A protein has these predicted regions:
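Extracellular Ig-like/FN3 beta-sandwich strand-entry sites
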Residues: 285, 297-299, 328-332, 389, ...
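Solvent-exposed segments in extracellular or luminal domains encompassing
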Residues: 317-330, 419
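Exposed beta-strand and adjacent loop surfaces of beta-rich binding modules
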Residues: 13, 285, 299-303, 379, ...
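Low-complexity, Pro/Thr/Ser/Gly/Ala-rich linker/spacer regions in secreted
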Residues: 1, 266-267, 332, 353-374, ...
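Short, composition-biased motifs enriched in small/polar/acidic residues
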Residues: 361-437
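Active-site-proximal segment of zinc-dependent metalloprotease catalytic domains
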Residues: 1-24, 36, 40-178
Length: 437
């Protein structure tokens, strides 16, 4: 297996694996080039382009005895590793057997080299455009198809097939497909009640339902014709990559793909402290840090909380606070990360949000000043008591803002008596005892 694209650990990336089909041993070097071009083409199209950093890509080089693929309609048969074939009736459709001679081989290779693969792509070395979704399990595309969607060209067959595999998007074709199950997908529906349409959050109140084609491009509505039916089935927009080659995904399909990415990848790549449950017993400042997986064109939103209360201005990747600002006992420090992309309007499972919470048990020394005594000569004394194993500092202030140290000492049997050294009248003075940081 050869790495094509690395953006981070495979445990938190959407891992693409491209497998060679119809490449002889002498053509495997070209396969790596073709696989790289295929990945770059796919990730150049929205919404993948915005989330390119969320992907890794790899190539598995498997030699075939012969180059190309079967074309039964032309009487051409090739001896290839995955036994791919163009459909005899629809020569744009490429499939591999679902048994151990095709799909089983793909599964075995992925299990050996990349068990955490979320998007397998079988790249067929054939100039005739074609592909399929491998019955929902993988994207299959020919080199002839991929060459037509490299930048600056628009999305094509490969991009279309990944919509099936990643987001379970449906075909928006209107030509009949006998026996195709009448199951709705994220972008197809039979529903005509405006209030019940699954993508209603994208539909403007002044858009007619059903929506006439005269409304034009870029308007989300309810356009008749989808799911291999001319009538009775509806799609979100007039044109979309799930119905036409050479056009981008519509808003609803783009949303479904972004949600599909976040089903597999979390926005928080790492955090510090690594332990989310710890104790503190000193005043040393605590710093919490996030490592985020940022999209290409916008940044994720961050908000820090202490005990459920949002901290004003705490929106950076790190957050520092003093344990003194927390109560003794159990406290919770949380960071909420949101992707506020305009590509998603409906996220019922909150996939675009992640919260990291640290449970911090605070046991800071508790000091008290009490039992003031008036002494002769204008002096006085008071007692410091409580718990301060690392010692304490007595400080004084005339305004409660500026504090000056007077004495550093330790408690003996839980207490200490302080006597002021100044004789005679003195200005009003405030005193406190604090533990060192």
């Amino acid at each position: 297996m050869q790495t094509i694209l690395t953006n981070g650990p495979t445990s938190n990336r959407l891992n693409i694996v491209v497998l060679s089909e119809g490449y002889t041993n002498s053509q495997l070097a070209q396969f790596v080039v073709d696989a790289t071009n295929a990945v770059n083409a796919l990730l150049s199209h929205p919404p993948y382009q915005e989330y390119r950093n969320y992907f890794n890509a790899f190539a598995i080089k498997i030699a075939s005895n012969q180059s190309g693929s079967d074309h039964p309609s032309s009487g051409i048969y090739r001896d290839t590793y995955f036994n791919s074939t163009y459909d005899p009736l629809a020569d744009y459709l490429i499939t591999i057997p679902v048994d151990s001679t095709g799909q089983g081989k793909v599964d075995a290779l992925l299990q050996s080299f990349m068990p955490n693969c979320q998007l397998p792509i079988v790249l067929v070395n054939d100039p005739t455009q074609g592909g399929s979704d491998g019955f929902g399990t993988m994207a299959i595309a020919s080199t002839g198809a991929v060459s037509g969607e490299k930048p600056p060209y628009p999305p094509g067959i490969l991009t279309h097939e990944t919509g099936h595999v990643l987001a379970n998007l449906g075909d928006e074709y209107t030509a009949p497909y006998s026996g195709f199950p009448d199951t709705e997908e994220p972008n197809t529906t039979q529903q005509t009640n405006r209030l019940l349409i699954k993508w209603k959050v994208w539909v403007s109140t002044n858009t007619p339902i059903p929506t006439p084609e005269t409304v034009g491009e870029g308007v989300v509505g309810l356009f008749e014709g989808a799911h291999y039916h001319e009538t009775g089935w509806y799609r979100p927009e007039l044109n979309c990559a799930m119905g036409n080659l050479g056009v981008p995904f519509c808003s609803v399909c783009s949303e479904a793909l972004v949600l599909a990415i976040y089903q597999r990848v979390r926005p928080v790549d790492g955090f510090s402290p690594a332990s989310t449950n710890f104790s503190v017993s000193t005043n040393q400042a605590l710093t919490f840090t996030l490592s985020l997986l940022q999209p290409t064109m916008h940044n994720l939103d961050v908000q820090w909380f202490t005990n459920g209360v949002a901290r004003s201005g705490a929106t950076n990747l790190s957050f520092t606070l003093s344990p003194e600002s927390l109560s003794n006992g159990t406290n919770w420090i949380s960071a909420r990360v949101n992707d506020l992309t305009s590509l998603v309007r409906n996220d019922p499972a909150n996939l675009l949000s992640q919260i990291v919470t640290w449970t911090v048990d605070v046991t800071l020394p508790q000091l008290r000043l009490d039992s003031p005594l008036r002494l002769t000569g204008g002096k006085f004394a008071f007692r410091v008591s409580g718990n301060a194993p690392q010692g304490f500092v007595i400080q004084s202030s005339t305004n409660l803002l500026d504090w000056a140290p007077l004495e550093t000492n330790y408690l003996v049997a839980g207490q200490f008596w302080h006597t002021n050294s100044a004789a005679g009248p003195s200005p009003r003075m405030f005193y406190r005892a604090a533990t060192p940081p």
